[in-house]
Amino acid sequence: MAVKMIKVHGSGNDFYLLDQTQFQAPLSDADLKQLAINICKRDGAGLYDGADGVLVVDKSEHPQVLGRMRVINADGTEASMCGNGLRTVARYLGTQNSQEDFRVQTMYADLKVQAVADFAAHVPAYSVEISPVTFDAQTLGMHANNDATTIINEKIPALSADLKFSAVAVPNPHLIAFVDHDTLVGPELGRIGEWMNDGKNQIFPDGVNVSFVEVLGPNSIFVRTFERGVGFTNACGTAMSASSLMYVLLHQESTDFNQEIHVTNPGGMVKTVVHQGADEEYWMELIGNATFVRIVTLPLEDALQGDYSPVTATETGEQVAYEDFVANLAKA
């Protein structure tokens, strides 16, 4: 049986998009895990240049919803949400159904998505909702500071003597620290990220996404992320959304609710807007590219065994346009 996938990315956070409706019966969870582990390997061991994960598209039985998205990380674990991936799934479903404004089912919520103006020629963009938001330690799977119920801009002595952290789920868990530039690019993020995702630590036994954030100016931040199940990534959409929320809550001298925030990352740039509802619940808009790099086809049996010799691929040309867009960002 042949399997068709699309290599996609948002801000360089790259995935293989797999539409399960192409099969008579969906793949088992075990097969999805094995597929992700195989094709996502880097350093030439995976399919082409590997990926951060697999975006699994299925039909949804929810009303007014075009489809369902699941996220399988490169290590085979399942993530509850992926903002960058959601933009590419939104584009795929919108194109398939000739719609530009709809909802997509995710693990915890049916989220609003919408096509927006292209970032540049051949760089299509989408806006997606990031929610729900909670600071609850139990939901986060966090055990820190004598089992504090929340951690917002506080030191966690076991992690660092100097840095202050905020813990928030959007809905996947994030640990965020605002830092200076030297700390942003230094080794501390890798040390903390690896430790918090080793499966042995007692603070986040199930792991956590760790981000360092540098304030660049009014409504402008840089976010660098060590992603749970992936490691260092070019960008993490939920991390940039969570970082934007904490930026608004902790740095209102520089930004505020309902203002467009320019978020730079190692893979490019996105825009975010943080909203607060009447019931004081938060949600974010994540606005960024939804790039389709190539369409690949290969026998499923070979993909599950890590044999990519029979693969065929068609390049879309969009990656060149995206790289030009990023290069122009650097010149601005």
Curated annotation (Swiss-Prot):
Signal peptide: none annotated. The keyword Cytoplasm applies. Pathway: Amino-acid biosynthesis; L-lysine biosynthesis via DAP pathway; DL-2,6-diaminopimelate from LL-2,6-diaminopimelate: step 1/1. It comes from the Bacteria. Substrate binds at N13, N73, G83, N84, N172, N209, E227, R228, G237, T238. The record marks H174, E227 as: Could be important to modulate the pK values of the two catalytic cysteine residues. It is an enzyme of class 5 (isomerase). Its EC number is 5.1.1.7. Its main location: cytoplasm. The keyword Isomerase applies. GO terms for molecular function: diaminopimelate epimerase activity. It holds the Pfam family DAP_epimerase. GO terms for cellular component: cytosol. Coiled coil: none annotated. It is found in: Cytoplasm. GO terms for biological process: lysine biosynthetic process via diaminopimelate. It catalyses: (2S,6S)-2,6-diaminopimelate = meso-2,6-diaminopimelate. Keywords: Amino-acid biosynthesis, Cytoplasm, Isomerase, Lysine biosynthesis. InterPro entries: DAP_epimerase_AS (IPR018510), DAP_epimerase_DapF (IPR001653). The active site is at C82 (proton donor), C236 (proton acceptor). PROSITE patterns: DAP_EPIMERASE (PS01326). Homodimer. PANTHER family: DIAMINOPIMELATE EPIMERASE, DIAMINOPIMELATE EPIMERASE, CHLOROPLASTIC. Catalyzes the stereoinversion of LL-2,6-diaminopimelate (L,L-DAP) to meso-diaminopimelate (meso-DAP), a precursor of L-lysine and an essential component of the bacterial peptidoglycan. This is Diaminopimelate epimerase. It comes from Lactiplantibacillus plantarum (strain ATCC BAA-793 / NCIMB 8826 / WCFS1). The lineage of its organism: Bacteria, Bacillati, Bacillota, Bacilli, Lactobacillales. The gene is dapF.
